[in-house]
Each structure stands twice: as C-alpha cells, then as structure tokens.
Amino acid sequence: MNIFIMRHGEAEVMANSDKARHLTVYGSKQAFLQGQWLKQHLSTLVINSLDRILVSPYVRAQETFHQVNQAFDLELENKFEIWEGITPYGHAHSVIDYLEVLKDEGVKSVLIVSHLPLVGEIVAELYGKRNPISFYPATIAQLLWDGNKSEILMHQASPVIYLK
C-alpha cells in the first residue's frame, strides 16, 4: 500500500479554538502546489490516483484537502472521509489498525491529511524507527507499506512561495 502522509498547510496562529484555525493565504497556496506536485508524482507511478483520503475534522486540514482536491480537478471529492482519529492528539496505533482494514478491503493508495505530532508518529510507527522527516507545513511523505513494515520512498516539502 502506498501511503501519503501530509501535514496541513500553514495555519493562523490565533482562533477561537485550535480546531477552528484556518489556513493562511500562504498555507492555501502551499496546499494547492503540493496537490499539483502529488498529482504529477502519481502520474509517474503505476497508481495514477488515490483510492482513499483520510482528513482530520480540524478546519485547517479540511481546507488543505480542499486545495489538494482543486489541484486534482475535484476528482478526489468522493474518495475522502473525515476521521476524528487523526486530530493532533490521535493515536498512531489506531491509524495503523485502520490502514490494515483498508488494505484488507483492497485499497492500494491512501492520503492522510493531519497534524503534528501525529504525522511524525504515524511515520515512526510504520517505519519501525524514529521519524527522520521534518514535517514543515504541507510536507508530504510517501511510504510503501506491506502490512508489517514500510520503507520511506520519498518526501516532498512545500516549495518557498513568494506572495505579491
């Protein structure tokens, strides 16, 4: 199973609650550009698309998915689910358990849009070692997972963007 783990784009510092924080203009652009990169990257693989997308219920993660979906010309619209299990304080073991269910259902590729510290914990759990990736906003890591162990195939940090 190809697993793409993405941290949300740059978010506002202040909001009524952590859950309600929106992406900044910069964060929206990061997410869109990473979506374009991911679409192009998938076209070079046998995968060509994503089977399932898991998105945190937090506003900034949903806005990140929206931008990625825009980059995919809305083709991901019917493939995503909002899951409470991938909020910042979710548990990597629960995520792995759910990935096992998806793998058993025949899902070959998954995008997870979530938060620190969980994104790093998921990588560490799948990889079986300390997470070597710095998850800056909108970073995407790709892991190939066989159900027991995984290897990190690559990671893509968001490019530097100059806003006018």
From Swiss-Prot:
The record's CDD domains line, in alphabetical order, gives:
HP_PGM_like
**Enzyme Commission (EC) number:** 3.1.3.-
Origin: domain of life = Bacteria
Could you tell me the Gene Ontology terms of the biological process aspect for this record?
A: protein modification process
Looking up PANTHER family in the UniProt record yields: PHOSPHOGLYCERATE MUTASE-RELATED
Q: Which cellular component terms (GO) are annotated to the entry?
A: cytoplasm
Q: Which UniProt keywords apply?
A: Hydrolase, Protein phosphatase
Which organism was this protein described from? Haemophilus influenzae (strain ATCC 51907 / DSM 11121 / KW20 / Rd)
Which Pfam family is an annotated match for this chain, by its short name? His_Phos_1
Q: Which GO terms describe its molecular function?
A: protein histidine phosphatase activity
Give the family per the record: Belongs to the SixA phosphatase family.
Q: What is this protein called?
A: Phosphohistidine phosphatase SixA homolog
